[in-house]
A protein has these predicted regions:
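Domain-level signal for Mg2+-assisted phosphodiester chemistry and nucleotide/NA-binding surfaces
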Residues: 2-3, 9-120, 166
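Nuclease catalytic cores that cleave nucleic-acid phosphodiester bonds
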Residues: 95, 99-200
């Protein structure tokens, strides 16, 4: 089944299994995933909890046959902030999940979680921005694929593109970030059917 190419971004957007973009096999790709944000988006779509999400299928979908330089997963580290059994269960569940990702070859980058009036991640976006910039300077990749939704990363994306690298924004077709799509070289938008195929 082929899906229409979206016209919300320039120069080209990809939806589902159809794309108008040639991918040289020698092209080096680094994938940056904001884990907390991706979890929320999947949960909104009924994928989590109760189902497993196949990150290997997501990576294959984003690579499209190109060479993987590295895949990075950024997340706030859960703490037992109130010394309860429930919080400890959450700590252990996250550690188990991240260990499983490491076995799949992911580099795990941990930020902090602040517990005040609401639970907030801190430091994750900064880590992504720094790694995007350093990776472009040190020629670690030709293309950065960013699975994010925070427009605070736009300055880093603009800098990376100014150095002759490409940045692909990967989001969900129902609610893409128009700001990130506009500033990126390419947008890859997952349709509901794509997400369903990645859920075990």
């Amino acid at each position: 089944m082929y899906n229409a190419v979206s016209n919300i971004t320039a120069p080209v957007a990809i939806q589902g299994q159809f794309w108008l973009y040639t991918c040289p096999m020698a092209e080096k790709v680094t994938i940056f995933i904001d884990g907390g944000n991706l979890y929320k988006r999947l949960k909104e779509r009924g994928v989590l909890p109760g189902k497993r999400f196949n990150y290997a299928k997501l990576i294959d979908f984003l690579l499209r046959g190109r060479s993987l330089s590295s895949k990075r997963y950024y997340v706030g580290a859960v703490r037992n902030y109130d010394q309860t059994a429930r919080s400890q269960e959450m700590v252990e569940a996250q550690q188990k999940f991240l260990s499983a990702l490491e076995l799949q070859g992911f580099l795990i980058e941990r930020g902090r979680i602040v517990y005040d009036h609401k639970i907030r991640e801190k430091g994750v976006d900064v880590k992504i921005a720094i790694d995007l910039v350093i990776g472009s300077v040190e020629n670690e990749y030709d293309t950065a694929v960013v699975v994010i939704s925070d427009t605070d990363l736009i300055p880093a994306i603009k800098y990376v593109i100014s150095r002759g690298k490409k940045v692909e924004y990967a989001g969900f077709a129902e609610r893409p970030s128009l700001g990130l799509a506009r500033e990126s070289s390419l947008s890859v938008l997952l349709l509901p059917d794509d997400v369903s195929r990645m859920a075990n």
